[in-house]
């Protein structure tokens, strides 16, 4: 992997750091997304997946679980029944 070094003022560095922090990202993540915006869709999908899985995990820990078996859920999904 290659490394890129950019000389900037302390003010520019602080601004870049703040912009990245506002989006919950590292400076590296923020800069790469700005340089290569085509990867943003994949990054957004990854963030959505992490959020969805986090919600599911929290629901499970709170006792909100299904009493159905995996087979029953699969059969429902394949038949289109969404009861």
Curated annotation (Swiss-Prot):
Q: Know the name of this protein?
A: Antitoxin ParD
Q: Show the GO MF annotations.
A: protein homodimerization activity; sequence-specific DNA binding; toxin sequestering activity
- UniProt superkingdom: Bacteria
The extra comment attached to this record reads:
Plasmid IncP-alpha RK2 is maintained at 5-8 copies per chromosome.
Q: Answer whether the UniProt record assigns the keyword Transcription to this protein.
A: yes
Q: How does it assemble?
A: Forms a homodimer in solution, interacts with ParD, possibly as a ParD(2)-ParE(2) heterotetramer, which neutralizes the toxic activity of ParE. Both the homodimer and heterotetramer bind DNA, although genetically only ParD is required for full operon repression. Another study has shown that it is a ParD homotetramer that binds the promoter.
Q: Which Gene3D superfamilies match?
A: Antitoxin ParD (6.10.180.10)
Q: Name one GO biological process term.
A: plasmid partitioning
**Organism annotation:** Escherichia coli
Lineage at the top is: Bacteria, Pseudomonadati, Pseudomonadota, Gammaproteobacteria, Enterobacterales
This protein's UniProt keywords: DNA-binding, Plasmid, Plasmid partition, Repressor, Toxin-antitoxin system, Transcription, Transcription regulation
Q: Which InterPro entries match?
A: ParD, ParD_sf, Ribbon_hlx_hlx
Q: Any keyword Cell inner membrane? A: no
| Purpose | Antitoxin component of a type II toxin-antitoxin (TA) system involved in plasmid partition. Inhibits the anti-DNA gyrase activity of toxin ParE; reverses and restores gyrase catalytic activity in vitro. The parDE operon alone is capable of stabilizing an RK2-derived minireplicon under defined growth conditions in several different Gram-negative bacteria. It does so by the post-segregational killing (PSK) of plasmid-free cells, also referred to as a plasmid addiction system. Binds its own promoter, autorepressing it; gentically only ParD is required for full autorepression.
């Amino acid at each position: 992997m290659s490394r890129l070094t950019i000389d900037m003022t302390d003010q520019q560095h602080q601004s870049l750091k703040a912009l990245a922090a506002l989006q919950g990202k590292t400076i590296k993540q923020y800069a790469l997304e700005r340089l290569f915006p085509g990867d943003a869709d994949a990054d957004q999908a990854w963030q959505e997946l992490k959020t969805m899985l986090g919600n599911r995990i929290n629901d499970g820990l709170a006792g909100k679980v299904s009493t159905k078996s995996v087979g029953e859920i699969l059969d429902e999904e394949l038949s289109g029944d969404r009861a």
